[in-house]
UniProtKB/Swiss-Prot annotation:
Residues 1-39, 163-164, 214-215, 253-257, 312-326, 404-409, 453-466 are cytoplasmic. It comes from Dictyostelium discoideum. GO terms for biological process: protein N-linked glycosylation. The gene is stt3. Residues 541-543 are annotated as: Interacts with target acceptor peptide in protein substrate. This is Dolichyl-diphosphooligosaccharide--protein glycosyltransferase subunit STT3. Component of the oligosaccharyltransferase (OST) complex. One of its GO terms (cellular component) is oligosaccharyltransferase complex. Catalytic subunit of the oligosaccharyl transferase (OST) complex that catalyzes the initial transfer of a defined glycan (Glc(3)Man(9)GlcNAc(2) in eukaryotes) from the lipid carrier dolichol-pyrophosphate to an asparagine residue within an Asn-X-Ser/Thr consensus motif in nascent polypeptide chains, the first step in protein N-glycosylation. N-glycosylation occurs cotranslationally and the complex associates with the Sec61 complex at the channel-forming translocon complex that mediates protein translocation across the endoplasmic reticulum (ER). GO terms for molecular function: dolichyl-diphosphooligosaccharide-protein glycotransferase activity; metal ion binding.
Amino acid sequence: MKRSEKSSTSVVSNNKQQDVNIISSNEVGVKEENKGHQEFLLKVLILSVIYVLAFSTRLFSVLRYESVIHEFDPYFNYRSTIYLVQEGFYNFLNWFDERAWYPLGRIVGGTIYPGLMATASLVHWSLNSLNITVNIRNVCVLLSPWFASNTAMVTYKFAKEVKDTQTGLVAAAMIAIVPGYISRSVAGSFDNEGIAIFALIFTYYCWIKSVNTGSLMWAAICSLAYFYMASAWGGYVFIINLIPLHAFFLLLTGRYSHRLYIAYSTMFVIGTILSMQITFISFQPVQSSEHLAAIGIFGLLQLYAGLSWVKSHLTNEAFKKLQRLTVLFVLSCAAAVLVVGTLTGYISPFNGRFYSLLDPTYARDHIPIIASVSEHQPTTWASYFFDLHILVFLFPAGLYFCFQKLTDANIFLILYGVTSIYFSGVMVRLMLVLAPVACILAAVAVSATLTTYMKKLKAPSSPSDANNSKESGGVMVAVLTVLLILYAFHCTWVTSEAYSSPSIVLSAKQNDGSRVIFDDFREAYRWIGQNTADDARIMSWWDYGYQLSAMANRTVLVDNNTWNNSHIAQVGKAFASTEEDAYIQMKALDVDYVLVIFGGLTGYSSDDINKFLWMVRIGGSCDPNIKEQDYLTNGQYRIDKGASPTMLNSLMYKLSYYRFSEVHTDYQRPTGFDRVRNVEIGNKNFDLTYLEEAFTSVHWLVRVYKVKDFDNRA
């Protein structure tokens, strides 16, 4: 009886214990579920804040000035978007612009990447379809900030795929405000790069996803992302070379897999076919030297996969013999195709900009028109810190953590980082390509460091070194926190002061901190549009061609497309010649008005006098009589009394300094004192014979001259 009572008691106690265990396990499950919900909500909140931050931090220019298009190239994009919205896509692709490159004109549809215009017009159409009436200008102004927010989200997914969620959140926060990317994505910067960086990161994310999963769907999405990138920016060549490089390194390191084969073969075939639908690209993916690496890696993967299959059906000796013969045959065929294609002209050589990336001195020595563009200059060390701040130091740390654990994704990140750091050093414009990977690698370093030291703060290894661990962990976390706060302050300051000023509206700060606005450009363009004939031809340096076409709606001789070097050289030659010789050239080109930018009164350093030597160099590339040495004095570029006679009598000098001797720029200086060059001009007393002043803006920034008609007696 007692035994039965004991046994029943033990059964009851066991049941109670099981119930307690079930309850405790359920409680643990509920807690974990609640924790998962909390983490999800926190992640959504952080990403929402980042999304809003990425958009709002780019609105300084709109708040400070107004909704206005920035820089030079965006004005052509804006004008083209208006044409696309009004005329439709078919007419846009067949648009011949008779107001550009007089008397040649320009076939627009076949000479541009239409992705930006198509995106803006699609957004405009979508909003108006929803009865949200929005002006196309506002769509163009705000498109880049919106895509910057989308880029932050894609960067989160990319970094998460490479490492983990924490890294993704840090990377998204960093790229939301990094100056290197903001420089091309502020409100009003309606340029190709504004949407292209989103397409770039999205393509890379889809590529890593397809390599990790071997999914045909992700490879197809990667192809679509690549197609969008190809439609938006010429930087798509970076993608179609980096992805093959990644595949090649995976082969070299013995990481070949069916996942890689599926991802690359699908992406290359579909992506190439789609990119060839862009009129400007056409057959370049199968003809140009820039795409040969992608074709070669595609063939190499097919060969490797085929040999791997054959190997399972042959003996080792037979396979080695077949392998040698196959490799020899393929190399011979590839060399023959390369030689024949190059000799027959089927395979086109590298273009000038691509050569400049491989050889930084190439453009300077052979193509001055490329070297004259400021964004094509090599990057200084100061620019790296200015555009990246602490990312400069976290970048190598991120590479170190990637090397510690080599995966397919980490190898891609390493290759992306190393190649982009090289190209950004060659051309300052490509800082834009470096900024995203710098943020991701910095996020890898920050995330790994914080994870390590936060563990020390929470759980010391033993009581003996608990204090040391907590102290070192606390110091490291505090240092990183301070650095990230400084990064945020620096990014905000750079965005506000350096990258939120439209070139068409200038401003300066007075001693009391208030701003003075110089709206001379729009004033001049409005005057030209209202006071000149509709068919008037305007000659200016190519920098201002797009703005003249969009703002004044007048015909220009050259513009920022710079597709015809000899035509630009004719304009450069005219500005470098004497007034009499230039008059003959201008009449031959049917020029009605000449526009020059002059900053001597206001201190605007980006005026035509400072650009004049580039006009001389480019003009001299087509006329050997134009020599740079003739415009220098003992190797120095001067505009004072010590300037060379050739310089003092050039058309550019006379148009810039005409009547400047009547102006006092400073009470302590003589008349005709140039505030940019900080000298008194050398030639004051001269008149114009063949041109007459038509308009000078309030601050003398823009000067317009009318070309006189021929004297009948002549």
